[in-house]
């Protein structure tokens, strides 16, 4: 299954230092056990189209071999460290899980 998470950072957290810390956190969360593969990125500079949304600041893309492994990731301490450490930066978070 695929776990996609989109983050919108609050305006006051757009500075380079905060972004660097957040990116380090994204790197760490991609290393949590049970993840088959993980990566993150920023909106791609593709041509504007009515169907694309580039309003987010970061996207996190995690693959799991099963829903059970996804569920184990959700309660892993490193996941909690990420959420607790960065939740105050977020204006909005959108999760899309695909099977």
Please place each PLM-identified region on the residue numbering.
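Short S/T/G/P-rich N-terminal loop/turn motif that feeds into the first structured element of a domain
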Residues: 1-57, 65-69, 99
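Conserved short hydrophobic interaction patches
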Residues: 25-29, 76, 89
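Active-site scaffold segments
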Residues: 61
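C-terminal structural segments of small proteins and small subunits
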Residues: 64-88
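Charge-dense polyanion-binding interfaces
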Residues: 85-99
């Amino acid at each position: 299954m695929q776990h996609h998470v989109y983050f919108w950072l609050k305006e006051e957290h757009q500075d380079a230092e905060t972004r660097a810390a957040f990116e380090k956190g994204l790197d760490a969360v991609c290393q949590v056990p049970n993840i088959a593969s993980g990566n993150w990125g920023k909106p791609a500079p593709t041509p504007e189209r009515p169907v694309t949304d580039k309003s987010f600041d970061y996207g996190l893309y995690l693959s799991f071999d099963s829903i059970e492994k996804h569920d184990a990731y959700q309660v892993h301490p490193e996941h909690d460290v990420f959420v607790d450490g960065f939740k105050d930066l977020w204006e909005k978070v959108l999760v899309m899980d695909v099977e």
